[in-house]
């Protein structure tokens, strides 16, 4: 009933957990209480699919991600996660999970939080580091499955991109890397909107 109330209020997506296991699932920062989704969490994912609410797997444990990918009949999102191949943090997605998310039509948004961008020098993480994460996803699965999730309200901000007023620098860097205007527009929101639109389609 709460999902339905959220939906009526205009909630477009829900993150399944934060920095700890809950009644739905295991968190990347938790103790692995459920081994992924709980039985109730499976019910919630199924109902979110039914009513057309996007599922956000940022903060989720690997086992939770895997359960969601297997269970969800709609594309999912990781609203603020980066690439584990470039920054070995449990909050980031490894290459196999990035591929799985993309194969389902989903999108991951690179998080501009230093600890998820540069493992060795989180306080010195730069805009260039973040651009490398974006390019890594593009090399793996193409430009239609990556976006940007600043997390400015959760500690985000990098050298060269500390606030919304500096985010134009990301566009300039992507142009310098040779990305097209259309690809950059998709990275800035088009990809996310595509997944949002997919929630309105009838389930197969």
Residue ranges and their predicted role:
Residues 39, 124, 128, 161-165:
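Soluble non-cytosolic domains of exported or imported proteins
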Residues 1-111, 115-118, 131, 135-138, ...:
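Extended, charged catalytic domains and RNA/DNA-binding interfaces, predominantly
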Residues 83, 154, 194:
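Active-site micro-motifs of SAM-dependent methyltransferase domains
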Residues 88-90, 121-123, 158-162:
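Short, solvent-exposed loop/turn segments at secondary-structure boundaries
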Residues 77, 147-148, 185-189:
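Beta-strand segments within the central parallel beta-sheet cores of soluble alpha/beta enzyme folds
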Residues 162-204:
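Mid-to-C-terminal alpha-helical segments outside catalytic/metal-binding sites
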Residues 111-112, 141-164:
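Short acidic/histidine-rich active-site segments
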